[in-house]
Amino acid sequence: MMRRADCRRVLAFVILLLALVVSKDAHAQSAAPAPQPGDYPAGEPFRGRAAKVDLRPPDNREFRTRLKEAAGEPANFAGHYVLTTWGCGTGCKRGAAVDLKSGKVIFLPGTVCCWAIDVPQNFEPVEFQLQSRLVVMNGQLNEQGPEGPHYFELRDGAFKPVTSASDKR
């Protein structure tokens, strides 16, 4: 039969092992690699004549000048979209993707603001690439929650969340 002191040592050892396993698992989760643009490939870049922008929805009409200007540019996102952003206050951006094939407008899933003060010179609050469906919004979404990268995939006509700075908390 084990003495009480031995039982305490065994129990302390088991608790220590559990704490190590839990902290190692938490570290592994927080160290998960960030989504990469290549993991969300888009089709070939669109080179045809752009469709007329759909201005029927009220939000589209409100930003018609920006959206029409964007539709006059070559594709810069997800193969056949032009992603455009504009200011919505001091240190705040919002934007939309214009489908050059259909004229449909898909607004970003919110505004992004409040990014760090000491950002690199090449910092962009909204990052995207021509041959990827991944968008990264760097800062706070809709002026709330954690500051950091928030990843979205353009899929089925909408920006779907992939992962976010709030997932790491």
Q: What function would you assign to each model-found segment?
A:
Residues E73-G110:
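Mid-length scaffold segments of soluble, non-membrane domains
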Residues A28-R49, P125-R169:
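Acidic, small-residue rich beta-repeat scaffolds with periodic aromatic anchors
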Residues G110-I117:
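Surface-exposed loop and turn segments in beta-propeller and other repeat-based domains
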Residues V53-P58, A97-P109, H150-V162:
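Surface-exposed loop/turn elements that mediate protein-protein interactions on large endomembrane-trafficking
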Residues A12-V21:
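Bacterial N-terminal signal peptides
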Residues D25-E73:
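Terminal domain-start segments
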Residues A70-N76, E124-Q131:
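Structural signature of eukaryotic scaffold interfaces centered on beta-propeller domains
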